[in-house]
Amino acid sequence: MKRPSFMPLSFRRRIQLLAAGKWIAFPLLPLVGYFSLRSGGRTALFSLVCLALFAAMAMWEASRRRQFIREARFPAFLGAKLREEYPQLSASDTDLALHGLRQFFLAHLRSNRKFVAMPSRLVDAAWHTFILHTRAYDQWCSSAFGKLMHHTPAEVLGRDPKRNDGLRRTWYWACKEESIDPRKPSRLPLLFALDKKFAIPGGFTYVPDCQDIDRRSGSDAYCGTSFGGGEASSGDAAGDGGDGGGCGGGCGGGD
């Protein structure tokens, strides 16, 4: 059977080779060295070299997965289905929505595959449509994350600490993707701006500055600090060169 054209074969194969190769580099090669090298000093040095190779390949693999999420084509049916559900959207509008989906997938990958919450009704609709095509979605997740990413409904900050952390995590990495300071945002990242931009029914509205809420009488926008939530796990950014996750002033929403 012909493979789906939206998933470049070279992308997928390179990621698979790197994912397998790092485990060959460590611990398999050090075990071989232990039994084949007579000198304990040589074995230790060989193991260190293998460990360095493992780390390099793991970093290369993560880079390839990020590149895949940013550049690999989505299946054509996603845009068409999204326009069926939201007929007010143009082709360029759906492209923006799918770019928001890429931001969400990147947030999951860059947080070391931790739970991330979906902040947009529009992007959630695209995600749900993708999931209904099981084989295509499974293949995408395998190349992007190495395992399946399960669907959770779109939401705003509430009383569930896990979901609040997931939303803050999404905020942090969406901001990082657009070079926005997540603690002092001057604007919203795309993923958090789409529902308001396209007037999505039941969509979520966010503001970049909590003080904006006080200046808007009758506004249905909310700020994350209204719930008294702390930062997401400080270890979220450890694997990607970040400086700790946090929602800052901009993580909020309403429906």
Regions from the language model: what does each represent?
Residues 34-53:
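Hydrophobic alpha-helical transmembrane segments
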Residues 3-25:
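Juxtamembrane interface helix immediately N-terminal to a transmembrane segment
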Residues 77-119, 123:
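Acidic, Ser/Thr-rich low-complexity segments on the non-lumenal side of membrane proteins
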Residues 22-36:
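N-terminal signal sequences
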Residues 45, 55-85:
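Transmembrane-cytosolic junction motif
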Residues 31, 37-41, 135, 145-146, ...:
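Long C-terminal interaction/binding lobes of large macromolecular proteins
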Residues 129-160:
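A membrane-cytosol interface segment of integral membrane proteins
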Residues 182-255:
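Short hydrophobic helical membrane-anchoring segments positioned at the boundary
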